[in-house]
A protein has these predicted regions:
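Active-site Tyr-X1-5-Lys
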Residues: 119-127
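SDR active-site strand-loop-helix element
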Residues: 6, 30, 73-74, 108-114
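A short helix->loop->beta-strand "cap" motif at the edges of active sites that frequently abuts
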Residues: 103-107
């Protein structure tokens, strides 16, 4: 199976990628900065993706070409100059799910944090 793993060089994403590699899946890893990822995890094909900008299904569709399954491990811990928790955790994820439906991808795994709550005390918890 050809699997897209988002957030693929983070802690959880890289563990998912390694397991899928052991299971002999064809892998596409997506992340913001892929030069180090290519060096550390050479068994995946890498594509650069700024998840805060992938907030429409149309934006995701090119990344989903020829993909059979998606494992979404994207996550940011707090808002900052490069990170927007709401855009990444809510808008981009919603757009990814819509794009998967449009592309006919029925196998989607989404990794989230326990305790997510729209009334939470931090932007991370609220997203």
């Amino acid at each position: 199976m050809r699997v897209l793993v988002t957030g693929a060089y983070g802690l959880i994403g890289s563990a998912c990628l390694a397991r899928l590699h052991r299971d002999r899946h064809a892998l596409v890893g997506a992340g913001r900065s892929i030069s180090e990822a290519r060096r550390r995890l050479p068994y995946a094909r890498w594509v650069a993706a700024d998840f805060a900008r992938l907030t429409s299904a149309q934006a995701w569709l090119p990344l989903l070409a020829d993909i059979d399954a998606v494992v979404n491990c994207v996550g940011v811990l707090q808002d900052g100059a490069r990170d927007d928790t709401w855009r990444v955790h809510v808008e981009a994820t919603t757009a990814l799910f819509e794009a998967c439906a449009r592309a006919g991808i029925r196998r989607v795994v989404h990794v989230s944090a326990i305790g997510a709550d729209h009334a939470g005390p931090t932007s991370f918890a609220r997203s």
